[in-house]
Amino acid sequence: MNQITKISQITSGDVAEYLRLPEVTADDINTLNNLIGISKAFISNYTGRTLEELDNYQDFVIVSLVLCQDMWDNRTLYVDSSNLNNVIETILGMHSVNLLPQETS
C-alpha cells in the first residue's frame, strides 16, 4: 500500500488493497468511492472537524480504512456507531471538538 499521510489521499485502490480484494470491478470502485466519502463524513460529524481539517491528523487514515472495511464486510452504506471498534472510538474521541462548550459573545 502507498504511504498515505492525509485522509484526502485515500483512493479506491488503497481501500481495495486494504480489503485484500483479488479483483476490482467498476461497480466495486464506485462502491469503494462511496464508502470513502461516507467514512470521511462520519469522521467529520463525529469529531466536529471540517473535511479540510481531517487532513491534519494522520491517524484518521486508518480510521477511514477500518470504517470502509466494516461497511464493505457488512454490505452497508452507513457506519453503525453503536458498534464502533474501541480503538476507532478512542482515536475519534481524541480529536473531537464538538463536545466542548462554545464561547458566546
Where on the chain are the PLM-derived regions?
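Divalent metal-cofactor coordination and adjacent catalytic microenvironments
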Residues: 1-105
